[in-house]
A protein has these predicted regions:
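Acidic/His-rich structured neighborhood in mature extracellular/periplasmic domains
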Residues: 2-148, 159-162, 171-173, 186, ...
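Short, solvent-exposed, low-complexity loop/linker segments
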Residues: 154-156
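Phosphate/adenylate-binding glycine loop and adjacent helical scaffold
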Residues: 151
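C-terminal soluble interaction/assembly domains
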Residues: 167-252
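Compositionally biased, low-structure terminal segments
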Residues: 136, 252-253
Length: 253
């Protein structure tokens, strides 16, 4: 487990952070926190703000859902801003569509409780009584708009994606309710990294390759065009004061 609430955590005693193993979310969280910080203490504080309500490390406070928690709170904290709807076609019209639907937080906690010990299950059921379902409207760039009829990338669209942006892979109302208790809208994420030659890469923690990898963003997306559930990408731009800092340059090159 690459992330928990630390040894004093009530539910999850895994480390608050580690650098020898990531999933896609913890990779983004750690890199973003490092880019915001100049020392270990600052990194630890920023990491808590990036991943927990009020920066308090408790399982019930964690941003479990990208669309309902992570995006909303990190926009409020002014770490990122959603620019998906600001990507325009050649007629200067936004190409964004919206993934809309409920995130059933109570049922997610109840479903998770089914596979836990009695004491841990009771903890999760108590949380389920407090949290509420949330309606989410998440903009995304449709894959079918990002490529032409011959599956060639429309470069003028990719060129509008800023360097260091966070790319979220969007599956509108991804049907996981029977498995985890709720549908989801986001299944994966990583960074868009623009090289000096202008090429835009997708840097992400790959569950298939078991490491952090880079691939041309257009190639990555082209390979999933046939997916029945993946429909597009959401773009969260990192605030320029962060992306343009000297510290951030170490991580986004």
């Amino acid at each position: 487990n690459p992330q928990g609430e630390g040894i004093d955590g009530e539910f999850d005693q895994a480390p608050l952070y580690c650098f020898d193993g990531f999933d896609c979310v913890t990779f983004v969280n750690n890199v973003l926190a490092l880019a915001l910080s100049h020392n270990l203490s600052e990194f630890q504080k920023k990491l808590l703000l990036i991943n927990y309500y009020d920066g308090i490390a408790r399982f019930d406070n964690r941003f479990h859902f990208m669309s309902a928690d992570w995006n909303v709170q990190n926009q409020k904290n002014k770490f990122v801003t959603d620019i998906t709807a600001d990507i325009f076609d050649e007629k200067n019209k936004s190409i964004a569509l919206f993934a809309e639907g409920e995130i059933d937080k109570p049922n997610w906690f109840l479903k998770k409780a089914e596979s836990e010990t009695a004491e841990r299950a009771d903890y999760l059921r108590r949380i389920a009584l407090i949290v509420k379902k949330e309606f989410v409207s998440l903009p995304y760039l449709p894959l079918l708009k990002l490529f032409d009829e011959n599956k060639n990338p429309r470069e003028y669209l990719f060129n509008q994606i800023p360097n260091t942006s966070i790319i979220e892979i969007v599956r509108p109302n991804w049907n996981l309710k029977d498995k985890i208790g709720t549908n989801l809208h986001v299944s994966h994420l990583g960074f868009a990294i623009r090289k000096s030659n202008g090429e835009l890469f997708f840097r992400h923690a790959s569950s298939e390759q078991k490491c952090v990898v880079e691939v041309l963003l257009s190639d990555y997306l082209k390979n999933i065009l046939k997916s029945q559930t993946i429909k597009g990408i959401n773009v969260q731009a990192i605030y320029q004061r962060i992306a343009g800092s000297a510290v951030a340059g170490l991580f986004f090159s």
